[in-house]
């Protein structure tokens, strides 16, 4: 009989009953024998649930995950045009290094695709230090012959420039900052920031005639994204937010996440093994400097980060749940004009209740006494063909007369 009663499930749920991982993991600097190939190595890598191994065996393991994610599902056609999104994070540099390595192998093991790299400069929106152009140019030199491009977040794809021709002083004015300032909550600003970045990637890919975009999201990022999508009212498209293949981008561009099977520990080890130098620190994305409780996204990321630290096996279970909750799609189903997610065809009771509360609050005492009138107004709002999903409509209400795009 279970000894955990209902009173045992407090604010922390049942996490107190779970046993945290106690395996000694990390980079062992002292020499030792690799348990995979038997070679004496000056540096051993010990991952969770794996034996200590040398640098070459670890790199083979990590790179195999990258190749296997693309090969098993056969989502990348031969000689496809690929755009790699680099933001300077450790994850994006790992993906860049893996892609470059896969393209410089012999003919038999080579990844047959034509890759380009784009760096989205978001420092004007982020409010931090200006982008390290010198470090970015060093990346371009290290990973030749890949072509590097730079574009500013909030600008049009027409402002795309090659890295060698880009100047931080010659930036086009854009209204993204103004729109972000109009949004009251950091949750809405981060959601809108993410959608704008994704739409810009689609525009850049279309301009460069790329059919696929590589995004450097790992398992922890996807677990946080799945939970965030559900809390923001994007549950109908949450499966696509964490899937290997996301086909919602404009102009038929497909978004791929080939690092979804890697975890934070493997990324950290890979950075050390290949001596990569990230251009930005972990946890420095837009809005994260405001603290863990400043937004739903920050709170969810902190929760998943705690899971990753204490119960690493749980994180992959969370994001893989997204593969099982995909909604039934219809060919004739309309999509959101902002995030391209499928629109709900049926009137949701939950959304109706939210709109009912909003209608009563905005109308005041007079209309709140007439329940039928309030319900009718709520239905009119939901049935209004604005081409937006629930989450994007909430952002539009905060922006007022400004358009999302």
UniProtKB/Swiss-Prot annotation:
Q: Which GO terms describe its biological process?
A: protein urmylation; tRNA thio-modification; tRNA wobble position uridine thiolation; tRNA wobble uridine modification
**Record Gene3D superfamilies:** HUPs
Q: Which UniProt keywords apply?
A: Cytoplasm, tRNA processing
Q: Name one Pfam family in it.
A: CTU2
Keyword Glycosyltransferase assigned to the entry: answer is no
Q: Does the keyword Cell wall biogenesis/degradation apply?
A: no
Which pathway does the record list?
tRNA modification; 5-methoxycarbonylmethyl-2-thiouridine-tRNA biosynthesis
One GO term describing the cellular component? cytosol
Q: What is its main location?
A: cytoplasm
Compartments in which it is found: Cytoplasm
The function of this protein is:
Plays a central role in 2-thiolation of mcm(5)S(2)U at tRNA wobble positions of tRNA(Lys), tRNA(Glu) and tRNA(Gln). May act by forming a heterodimer with NCS6/CTU1 that ligates sulfur from thiocarboxylated URM1 onto the uridine of tRNAs at wobble position.
What protein am I looking at? Cytoplasmic tRNA 2-thiolation protein 2
């Amino acid at each position: 009989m279970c000894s955990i009663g209902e009173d045992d499930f407090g604010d922390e749920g049942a996490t107190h009953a779970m046993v945290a991982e106690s395996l000694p993991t990390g980079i062992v600097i002292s020499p030792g024998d690799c348990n995979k190939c038997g070679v004496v190595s000056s540096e051993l890598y010990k991952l969770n649930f794996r034996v200590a191994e040398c640098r070459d065996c670890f790199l083979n393991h990590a790179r195999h995950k990258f190749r296997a994610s693309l090969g098993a599902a056969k989502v990348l056609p031969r000689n496809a045009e690929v755009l790699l999104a680099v933001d300077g994070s450790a994850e994006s540099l790992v993906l860049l290094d893996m892609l470059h390595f896969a393209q410089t192998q012999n003919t038999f093991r080579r990844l047959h695709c034509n890759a380009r790299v784009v760096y989205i400069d978001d420092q004007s929106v982020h409010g931090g230090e200006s982008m390290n152009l010198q470090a970015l140019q060093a990346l371009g030199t290290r990973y030749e012959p890949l072509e590097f491009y730079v574009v500013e977040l909030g600008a049009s794809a027409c402002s795309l420039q090659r890295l060698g021709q880009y100047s931080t002083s010659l930036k086009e004015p854009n209204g993204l900052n103004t729109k972000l300032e109009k949004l009251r909550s950091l949750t809405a600003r981060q959601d809108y920031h993410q959608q704008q970045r994704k739409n810009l990637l689609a525009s850049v890919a279309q301009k460069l005639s790329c059919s696929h975009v590589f995004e450097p999201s790992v398992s922890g990022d996807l677990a946080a994204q799945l939970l965030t999508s559900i809390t923001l009212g994007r549950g109908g498209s949450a499966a696509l937010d964490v899937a290997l293949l996301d086909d919602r981008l404009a102009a038929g561009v497909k978004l791929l996440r080939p690092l979804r099977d890697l975890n934070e520990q493997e990324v950290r080890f890979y950075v050390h093994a290949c001596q990569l130098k990230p251009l930005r620190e972990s946890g420095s994305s837009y809005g994260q400097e405001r603290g863990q409780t400043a937004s739903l996204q920050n709170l969810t990321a902190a929760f998943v980060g705690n899971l990753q630290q204490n119960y690493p096996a749980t994180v992959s279970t969370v994001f893989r749940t997204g593969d099982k909750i995909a909604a039934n799609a219809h060919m004739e189903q309309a999509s959101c004009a902002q995030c391209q997610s499928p629109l709900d065809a049926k009137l949701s009771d939950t959304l109706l209740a939210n709109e009912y509360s909003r209608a009563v609050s905005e109308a005041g005492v007079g209309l709140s006494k007439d329940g039928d009138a309030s319900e009718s107004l709520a239905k009119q709002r939901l049935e209004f063909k604005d081409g937006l999903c629930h989450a994007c409509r909430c952002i539009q209400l905060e922006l007022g007369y400004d358009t999302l795009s």
